[in-house]
């Protein structure tokens, strides 16, 4: 750290997200960014592109992130709030360069992904590291501190409880008491799910744990303990590659066949109503339920709920003051601020290779790369802002 930058100081917040097309002309270039390096045929991209075109070729995610950024500016007056994406403008590389040019020294990074996985956590650390590595040599390298995972924070859980209760009220009265709570999240290849977290299988275990906590919260409001289900959506890739199951549409059909009277579909794995919610749940899953006569309602996402926005401020304060108590509602406890080098390593990359990559980055003086990959604070090195 420098003499002018006190320990724990944070002088900006970076909102980090996936990105999405702003209009029809953006759809295919965006999808090419998402699938870069995977040799996905154009015919498959065209199929997915049609889903976006159903909504005017514009992802709802962007406007929702703009709204979240504005809410965060109101919640954190005096702290500049920036926004950067992995796959579309504003790109992280451009935003981090803007921050560095503005003199930002240490920024907290809030990623709109609550759970452990390569694509939902570690890959964002890699994206941040790449953005630092791409900075022009004339710019000092800011320190980027990714905020901890928030899947079991009350600021995420409590709004989801309220949204489940509201969705139950949308069901026909005779279906409300015995309705199932069908929690959903983005499916992952089994190999990636098994590698999630420091000891493996963190992604499905976190989802299950917080689903039970939310269901208990619903019970406190309604007096009814609803059956809890966990299903997945948005599967892609070759059919021969196993992914997390069951599919949400398949599970709705199974529930109807088993005599269920209704279900609330809860988009637990998403913080806003982006395309996976708008298409995979509101169109595909709803169609499957209608085909078998199962009444369903879809719970809302947290969006810009004031409790969720206040949670981000609380996570920033945890970085500013590591001695603050950290709130969490599952047996996982508050997720660590730092991730181990072997956490969420993609199956194609061994833990030894990942650790060596982090070590090599640190040895070359690229402090930002190592800090982001491992999730470390890096202030103890006394090398903040160095670039060699």
UniProtKB/Swiss-Prot annotation:
Q: Give the binding site residues for Fe(2+).
A: 186, 276
Q: For the region Disordered, what residue ranges are annotated?
A: 349-369
Q: Does the keyword 4Fe-4S apply?
A: no
Q: What does this protein do?
A: Involved in coproporphyrin-dependent heme b biosynthesis. Catalyzes the insertion of ferrous iron into coproporphyrin III to form Fe-coproporphyrin III.
Q: Would I find NAD among this entry's keywords?
A: no
Q: Which PANTHER family match?
A: FERROCHELATASE, FERROCHELATASE, MITOCHONDRIAL
Q: Which GO terms describe its molecular function?
A: ferrochelatase activity; metal ion binding
Source domain of life: Bacteria
Identification of the protein by name: Coproporphyrin III ferrochelatase
Q: Name one GO biological process term.
A: heme biosynthetic process
Pathway listed for it is:
Porphyrin-containing compound metabolism; protoheme biosynthesis
User: Known InterPro entries for this protein?
Assistant: Ferrochelatase (IPR001015), Ferrochelatase_AS (IPR019772), Ferrochelatase_C (IPR033644), Ferrochelatase_N (IPR033659)
Xref: CDD domains: Ferrochelatase_C (cd00419), Ferrochelatase_N (cd03411)
The record's GO CC annotations read: cytoplasm
Q: What EC number(s) is this enzyme filed under?
A: 4.99.1.9
Reactions catalysed: Fe-coproporphyrin III + 2 H(+) = coproporphyrin III + Fe(2+)
Give the UniProt keywords, A-Z.
Cytoplasm, Heme biosynthesis, Iron, Lyase, Metal-binding, Porphyrin biosynthesis
Q: Which family does it belong to?
A: Belongs to the ferrochelatase family.
Q: Where does Fe-coproporphyrin III bind?
A: 59, 124
Predominant cellular place of this UniProt entry's protein: cytoplasm
Q: Where in the cell is it found?
A: Cytoplasm
Q: What is the lineage of its organism?
A: Bacteria, Bacillati, Actinomycetota, Actinomycetes, Frankiales
Q: What class of enzyme is it?
A: lyase
- Which Pfam families does the UniProt entry name for this protein? Ferrochelatase (PF00762)
